[in-house]
């Protein structure tokens, strides 16, 4: 893990990039509902729901909205039946792309995702064509100016797999099953993370630049804009210098 550019490990999160607060809430509500449906409405015994609730409270979602989302998941209230579907493909430069969706209509979603790939220089792949290139990990994020030495000591003592200074943040990586216990240990040590979640980290990265990088980022942007897409992961690496150039010309 150590040594990856911050651009190679970034997870594109629609909730953080959407301009409208309503879109953030829509995605959080879906995650809460699906998590409750999958593992029950008690966050004490449902780690996925616990993570979703942490995000919701962090976004200042009201308790009433959260409770309704949980009840829709447990069946106490009627609601849309969302299904989790992952799509895979390749972008410009041969970059592997993994797309996590929550949809109430798989036919619509797969058609829209395929259309984005074909129109933006990519190719949609079959199931399993890309997923093996990513590893599921727990991710705990601290601001760049946090006490890295204290985080490193507390995280490794709690069983974290790695601690990486990625420039704009300090990232703690854990086995998926250890995420909650490591968060609790860090908080007990007086270290409050900005965010904790499950993520997909590329096993290897492909460096892209110039026109390929521009086309790739545009493809990812269009995928992110789709209403059914929750998360997009890609195994690319763009140097800081190239990213600065792209930002200056965008």
Swiss-Prot record:
This protein's record includes keyword Iron-sulfur: no
Biological-process GO terms, alphabetical: regulation of DNA-templated transcription
UniProt-recorded Gene Ontology molecular function terms: DNA binding
Taxonomic superkingdom: Bacteria
Keyword DNA-binding in record: yes
Coiled-coil spans in chain: none
Record's GO cellular component terms: cytosol
Protein's UniProt name: Probable transcriptional regulatory protein AFE_0059
Species this chain originates from: Acidithiobacillus ferrooxidans (strain ATCC 23270 / DSM 14882 / CIP 104768 / NCIMB 8455) (Ferrobacillus ferrooxidans (strain ATCC 23270))
């Amino acid at each position: 893990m150590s040594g990856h550019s911050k651009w190679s490990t970034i997870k594109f999160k629609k909730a953080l990039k959407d301009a409208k607060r309503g879109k953030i809430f829509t995605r959080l509500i879906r995650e809460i509902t699906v998590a409750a449906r999958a593992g029950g409405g008690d966050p004490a015994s449902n780690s996925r729901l616990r993570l979703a609730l942490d995000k919701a409270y962090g976004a200042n979602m009201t308790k009433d909205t959260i409770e309704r989302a949980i009840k829709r998941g447990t069946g106490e209230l009627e609601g849309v039946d969302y299904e989790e579907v992952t799509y895979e493909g390749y972008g410009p430069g041969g970059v592997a792309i993994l797309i996590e969706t929550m949809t109430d209509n798989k036919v619509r979603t797969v058609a829209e995702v395929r259309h984005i790939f074909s129109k933006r220089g990519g190719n949609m792949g079959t199931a399993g064509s890309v997923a093996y290139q990513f590893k599921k990990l727990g991710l705990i994020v601290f601001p760049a100016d946090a006490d890295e030495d204290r985080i490193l000591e507390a995280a490794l003592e709690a069983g974290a797999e790695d601690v990486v200074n990625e420039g704009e943040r300090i990232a703690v990586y854990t086995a998926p099953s250890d995420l909650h216990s490591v968060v609790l240990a860090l908080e007990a040590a007086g270290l409050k993370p900005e965010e904790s979640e499950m993520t997909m980290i590329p096993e290897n990265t492909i460096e892209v630049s110039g026109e390929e990088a521009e086309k790739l980022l545009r493809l990812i942007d269009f995928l992110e804009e789709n209403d059914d897409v929750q998360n997009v992961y890609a195994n690319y690496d763009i140097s800081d210098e190239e990213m600065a150039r792209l930002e200056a010309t965008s």
